């Protein structure tokens, strides 16, 4: 009886937290096997589901455990039911059915797939901002056209969408070498269509794309505003693949509902499967990315240097990669192996505008000017009191410290009484958002800036 209550409570919590599609996939498909000695054994039909349960649902297991058992329950995940002795044979048969779509068609040479071999799931750094998208991509790699079709992933530039598309394709080809896979940016798809149309070779074009097992289209927003004939051809290609249960994965810089200039019937089809977003990596994920990008370069990137870099670039991965390239160039010229904060700062200054303003404005000067403007002392700013005027002054000072200096997030936090770097990020995002909405605050901050400079 308690086990049933416990599991029902978990499902209730999960339903409140997850979207409908994520709840159906991650929660409904899971099964509680037993609770014994404060350990809940939970069956998950797919191994990639464990990451989501660990990152997003583990805490609700703890809460439900205290509610029902008055004890802390620890989850243990299994991927084969104890009584299931034929799962491997079933899986093998399923895979044969899934992937052996076109036995009479010749497989596509890897060089013609458009895939980049370097992009795999193994070297994709996972974090809170991409966990759902990664899980969905892994699910697609395991069950083509059965899990999510289409899978639509959107997010800003440099967040890993292209990496994930290639990882899906490479994973499929690793397991099923004869699968017909094609990765192509939407702009290239459009140009390919127009070339075949001009040459009168549309049958060849249709055969190329409609015989695929997996179509990976990058930056589908490029299709917006294109002529009716172009959108019509993509619509027909989409339908032909979907009707034959072939997998389609799309990426975009915005969600389907925000794709302007596209026929409504296309937008509707983009939402048939699952839509997932990727958001900028958090501080810890940026450090992990930096570690991954620098470990084989032959240089010693000190830990405080990585933290400094992670604090400087918080919008996308490409900025981090660009900074690493600049740093290694300086290191080669100077013939040094140890990468210190000073070397990193030298490289970053060359990448940022208003160089003259960088590293010359002390944080305490910012605190002083902000404090004078709002009638708040530096001591109050560094403290933890939550009075409205103090909170505003503190957040404005953190925002300006981020905008006007070259200091890392941890360094800024330290200058505000040892605040965590996440507090600085929150302050920066909050004030930046308020500036867009509140002209008075924008003018106040501009006035403070003039006094600081």
UniProtKB/Swiss-Prot annotation:
One of its GO terms (cellular component) is cytoplasm. One of its GO terms (molecular function) is DNA replication origin binding. ATP binds at residues 158, 160-162. Residues 74-113 are annotated as: Domain II. Residues 332-453 are annotated as: Domain IV, binds dsDNA. Domain I is involved in oligomerization and binding regulators, domain II is flexibile and of varying length in different bacteria, domain III forms the AAA+ region, while domain IV binds dsDNA. Belongs to the DnaA family. Oligomerizes as a right-handed, spiral filament on DNA at oriC. This is Chromosomal replication initiator protein DnaA. It comes from Streptococcus pneumoniae (strain Taiwan19F-14). The gene is dnaA.
